[in-house]
Amino acid sequence: MSDALLNAGRQTLMLELQEASRLPERLGDDFVRAANIIIHCEGKVIVSGIGKSGHIGKKIAATLASTGTPAFFVHPAEALHGDLGMIESRDVMLFISYSGGAKELDLIIPRLEDKSVALLAMTGKLHSPLGRAAKAVLDISVEREACPMHLAPTSSTVNTLMMGDALAMAVMQARGFNEEDFARSHPAGALGARLLNNVHHLMRQGDAIPQVMLATSVMDAMLELSRTGLGLVAVCDEQHVVKGVFTDGDLRRWLVGGGALTTPVSEAMTPNGITLQAQSRAIDAKELLMKRKITAAPVVDENGKLTGAINLQDFYQAGII
């Protein structure tokens, strides 16, 4: 039984891969035309489809929307019961139908023509009513479905999904859509955390900032070091400009060397240590700390004045790994 299941699964994958391998050679003038229509669309891209095509259409709409093209999915039945009112002349409709003859098209196509809405098609039948009405037709045809009964949409839905991805990625690259653009539409995701957060969003502030003055004794600096547990203390002048840092390592070296605890911390600190700019990207700051093999740093403003402190754990807790 297990061999039969494995063979069936592998056969399905092989058939789907075989059909999908034919897609690249089909991309031509219609693909370019479809991409350009979307790129120059002043409104939204409305994706529509029935059954399995509709399920894939929802994913295509979501991919377009998250990669710089305003898009949403409308079910054909809902479109015919009021949702056509959401579609305007500056919009584009991408209709998915393998047969190209979905009965809803008989009513939808004339309404789109009345509104001068550009129609794009994904279909397996290029000369179907849908194919003839569309300004650009993307060929998702298959020689056979992976279903052993040749009934359930399998290979054809894979082709549809891949063609949708190809179209979305081509449009995305043409728009110059980049990582930061992507992060702005995914603020709760890992990429959003990496690219949208600046140091000032994550840094410790107020009483949580370990700080002493240049004239503070090593003893008091040690107490401040212990109070915050950050592994360092920022050493500042009277204008709160950071002049150095006093770390656990500095304290150990000072004590091993026989230094007095009453000595000003300015003599035991590391002068001109690493500081981070409050407005810098958090991901860049984290990478700097890791490159320098340090775990924490003071945060300063554009004038070098202390505004906060941060350590690697603060980045990790924010999802910046």
Swiss-Prot record:
Disulfide bonds: none annotated. Its EC number is 5.3.1.13. It catalyses: D-arabinose 5-phosphate = D-ribulose 5-phosphate. PROSITE patterns: CBS, SIS. It holds the Pfam family SIS. The record marks K52, E104, E145, H186 as: Catalytically relevant. Zn(2+) binds at H75. Keywords: ATP-binding, CBS domain, Isomerase, Lipopolysaccharide biosynthesis, Metal-binding, Nucleotide-binding, Repeat, Zinc. ATP binds at G49, I50, G51, K52, S53, G54. Gene3D superfamilies: CBS-domain, Glucose-6-phosphate isomerase like protein, domain 1. The keyword Nucleotide-binding applies. Residues 203-261, 269-321 form the CBS domain. One of its GO terms (biological process) is keto-3-deoxy-D-manno-octulosonic acid biosynthetic process. Substrate binds at residues 68-69, 75, 81, 107-116, 141-143, 267. Residues 34-177 form the SIS domain. GO terms for molecular function: arabinose-5-phosphate isomerase activity; ATP binding; metal ion binding. It comes from the Bacteria. PANTHER family: ARABINOSE 5-PHOSPHATE ISOMERASE GUTQ, PTHR42745. Belongs to the SIS family. GutQ/KpsF subfamily. Homotetramer. Catalyzes the reversible aldol-ketol isomerization between D-ribulose 5-phosphate (Ru5P) and D-arabinose 5-phosphate (A5P). It is also able of sustaining the biosynthetic pathway of 3-deoxy-D-manno-octulosonate (KDO), a unique 8-carbon sugar component of lipopolysaccharides (LPSs). This is Arabinose 5-phosphate isomerase GutQ. It comes from Salmonella typhimurium (strain LT2 / SGSC1412 / ATCC 700720). The gene is gutQ.
